[in-house]
Amino acid sequence: MQFLRTALLSLLLLLLAAPSLALPSGISRSAPAATVCPEHCDPTRCAPPPTDCEGGRVRDACGCCEVCGALEGAVCGLQEGPCGEGLQCVVPFGVPASATVRRRAQAGLCVCASSEPVCGSDAKTYTNLCQLRAASRRSEKLRQPPVIVLQRGACGQGQEDPNSLRHKYNFIADVVEKIAPAVVHIELYRKLPFSKREVPVASGSGFIVSEDGLIVTNAHVVTNKNRVKVELKNGATYEAKIKDVDEKADIALIKIDHQGKLPVLLLGRSSELRPGEFVVAIGSPFSLQNTVTTGIVSTTQRGGKELGLRNSDMDYIQTDAIINYGNSGGPLVNLDGEVIGINTLKVTAGISFAIPSDKIKKFLTESHDRQAKGKTVTKKKYIGIRMMSLTSSKAKELKDRHRDFPDVISGAYIIEVIPDTPAEAGGLKENDVIISINGQSVVTANDVSDVIKKENTLNMVVRRGNEDIVITVVPEEIDP
């Protein structure tokens, strides 16, 4: 824009100058000679344009023959040739010359139609696109590589245009930028048998809820692991201690010792969540720090009894945001950056669930009370699976998505088998359907949970594809 003002001012001074500063020979200030265009354009009768066209080749005033265009800043609009590629003839006063306007026409200047700077492949910043194109033509004349446009704006790190669409409407990116520093990657280690060597066995995500290092995650992420390591967004790693676990609700609290204050995430009110709201799931799947998925809330009250997730008194948040093993334990947030749930499991494509933030608040309050009073808790039996109750409608939906899904309409559908657990050792696999244990029929996932509490050995019959397989699993006792 500054260049345009300068160019127009130069033209004005040129037109108001003394007679000694006349226009080029043969060009009058007004009443230019009429350009006579042929009735029909015959390109074969056009003179070949010069090979050296610094302003680029353009069509003549009749739109027929190729000619060399005038350079930026050249006089135009009278008897001169047309402006070069990307340039337009700007007349500060009066009207430009045209096929119908000649006598009252005024001279103008060739000005670039694009006024913003651009960065070229030669790492130079050009005032506008036209100057870059001129530089590219000069480079090609010298048999050098052409200069191409790398980006709008100056080379190097520029400032984002506040009026751009991506600045106005990228609200998801704003949320991620706000919450990412408080999201952590969790790595789990276990010692090899008959060896002191430790190996990573699983990973997950979590989020910081206190400035002194308290972190919330899923219970299944940290349960039954010898050592827990936490990595912050800046790459710093810390050993973590497990402070409290509610294996039934699948919530855990761990703690790292960190000097200074840590960024934290605040809990929102999941009771105020509405179906259709945008949500963002963030975590570290496959050990990739802060991978983001987005979606909407499908329903806010998917009952625990319906899902069979071992907590019949809790309603889960269902979302189509992608949740997997890696971002399990990470936060599900609203557009205000408030945590409204913990990413907990994916059933199939487009169907994932999160533990509501109101349940997290209850867990944190009860955990505080337990630690303040020094209460002890009894051990719980654990086999290491995540499951849901299978209904006829859910079975039909899964069969539509997976052709090899077992031909059953009830039972406990295994969503995940956690590595290095009794379930894995016994031979259970994802997508198995438990149909009986110790001779008792299994209709829901709650049936499995009840038997685990009572029995020391589980003789299971599972439907895998079209086969019934007998599997023995021995639960182990763990700290809750």
From Swiss-Prot:
Every PDZ domain range: 365-467
Residue numbers annotated as active site: 220, 250, 328
Residues the record marks as site: Involved in trimer stabilization: 169, 171, 278
Signal peptide: 1-22
Annotated disulfide bonds: 37-62, 41-64, 46-65, 53-68, 76-89, 83-110, 112-130, 119-155
PROSITE patterns named among the record's database cross-references: IGFBP_N_2, KAZAL_2, PDZ
Pfam families the UniProt entry points to: IGFBP, Kazal_2, PDZ_6, Trypsin_2
Record region (Serine protease): 204-364
Subcellular location field: Cell membrane; Secreted; Cytoplasm, Cytosol
Domain notes: The IGFBP N-terminal domain mediates interaction with TSC2 substrate.
Annotated family: Belongs to the peptidase S1C family.
Complex and partners: Forms homotrimers. In the presence of substrate, may form higher-order multimers in a PDZ-independent manner. Interacts with TGF-beta family members, including BMP4, TGFB1, TGFB2, activin A and GDF5.
Function: Serine protease with a variety of targets, including extracellular matrix proteins such as fibronectin. HTRA1-generated fibronectin fragments further induce synovial cells to up-regulate MMP1 and MMP3 production. May also degrade proteoglycans, such as aggrecan, decorin and fibromodulin. Through cleavage of proteoglycans, may release soluble FGF-glycosaminoglycan complexes that promote the range and intensity of FGF signals in the extracellular space. Regulates the availability of insulin-like growth factors (IGFs) by cleaving IGF-binding proteins.
PANTHER family in the cross-refs: SERINE PROTEASE FAMILY S1C HTRA-RELATED, SERINE PROTEASE HTRA1
Protein name: Serine protease HTRA1
Species in which this protein is naturally found: Rattus norvegicus (Rat)
Lineage: Eukaryota, Metazoa, Chordata, Craniata, Vertebrata
